[in-house]
């Protein structure tokens, strides 16, 4: 199976599907259609009925081969790649039998070094796909697409493997937070699903952050600095004051595990107007609400010193901790846990310090945990995929549909 995985991942990663947060269309970029149309064709060649809508959501079905009713399971992956780094002219490189030493990426000065990326030490002996140092790889999430496609191929080649109805979904714009926005849960018609969008071997994730964005707008009064006393209000300094009143220890670079944070993503302005953009994250719903409350309290504290209330705050929720919807349905986690145990894969159920499409889909009526893909260092030139771990991910997909047929 390794050769098929390499071939398919190479073909998919060389198609530029970078999404664009500034776009207002869905998909956000026309080039995502290139991979969507290819996948539609390949699924049809496998004999699967497909449904590609005007928003770039590609669904397909592998029909049940058993006579009893069992839950319909879905497998999801996203076609877009991150806008954080160059995604054009991707030239995948193959490292056979990785020796654990630093590896120079193409003709660049970039080096994939285990001292910097210690998770590479667990991949000694693996076949790796890496970049040439000039682009990201796009294994996030094309590795997930590959794993789903190869699992479907295997199931069709082995009809003796019993399974219920399987739904497949390939979606746009996950990297810019819009993946589920036009996802039709009723049309997808699955009882539950799994995103193949994790990273390291053994990840089984069903807890995510609660997430919100806060935009703080500070309005100043700009007068000539030579006559500014008691007249000027510097919006930049208001923004600095606002940020200084947030806990200095509760930022991404000083937190881990279940610890939440405030993250100042952007700060720009002039004396007359300054804007701060934060993301707010916490696994605990009560703490999440308290974080949002703290933002409003800081606004009020600053505004109390002015007559015209110069600081405005706009807070919008982005997604919530999917554990709230998944934990009441323990079988959705028990199924992959049994499969992991059967395959001798140690399950890592640490919470996601982020979100997936499943974070939103779970609150839309489709409970959706996340499973490893075998890739790492997403969104940049040091991205890699372990073909060996990808093969295990394919086995997990096959094991899940077998388990559902046997135990439900």
Swiss-Prot record:
Q: Name one GO cellular component term.
A: cytosol
* Disordered as annotated region, ranges: 1-28
Q: Where does Zn(2+) 1 bind?
A: 78, 140, 197
Q: Name one Pfam family in it.
A: Peptidase_M20
Main localisation: cytoplasm
Which amino acids does the record list as binding Zn(2+) 2? 140, 175, 379
Q: Name one GO molecular function term.
A: tripeptide aminopeptidase activity
Which compartment or compartments is the protein found in?
Cytoplasm
Stated EC number for the protein is 3.4.11.4
Q: Where is the composition biased (Polar residues)?
A: 11-28
> Could you tell me what reaction this enzyme catalyses?
Release of the N-terminal residue from a tripeptide
- List, alphabetically, the PROSITE patterns matched: ARGE_DAPE_CPG2_1, ARGE_DAPE_CPG2_2
Q: What protein name applies here?
A: Peptidase T
- UniProt source species: Staphylococcus aureus (strain NCTC 8325 / PS 47)
